[in-house]
Swiss-Prot record:
SUPFAM superfamilies: Ribosomal protein S18 (SSF46911). One of its GO terms (molecular function) is small ribosomal subunit rRNA binding. The lineage of its organism: Bacteria, Pseudomonadati, Pseudomonadota, Gammaproteobacteria, Chromatiales. This is Small ribosomal subunit protein bS18. Part of the 30S ribosomal subunit. Forms a tight heterodimer with protein bS6. One of its GO terms (cellular component) is cytosolic small ribosomal subunit. It comes from the Bacteria. NCBIfam families: S18. The gene is rpsR. HAMAP family: Ribosomal_bS18.
Amino acid sequence: MARFFRRRKFCRFTAEGVKEIDYKDLATLKDYITETGKIVPSRITGTKAKYQRQLSRAVKRARYLALLPYCDRH
């Protein structure tokens, strides 16, 4: 039987030494949102819990300020 090597997930924010996730950094936020507009869970992305909380807060702020859409285009 073939065994699949699963790539080890790592937190991009820890590796880059990011202190705070900014809601105005749309390029970073779009990497963690699905095409339907949902926030991707940390078990998929490998983001640590501390940064996942900051990420979700930043996405919600950006949505409130209309920088990001709440859902996909219909």
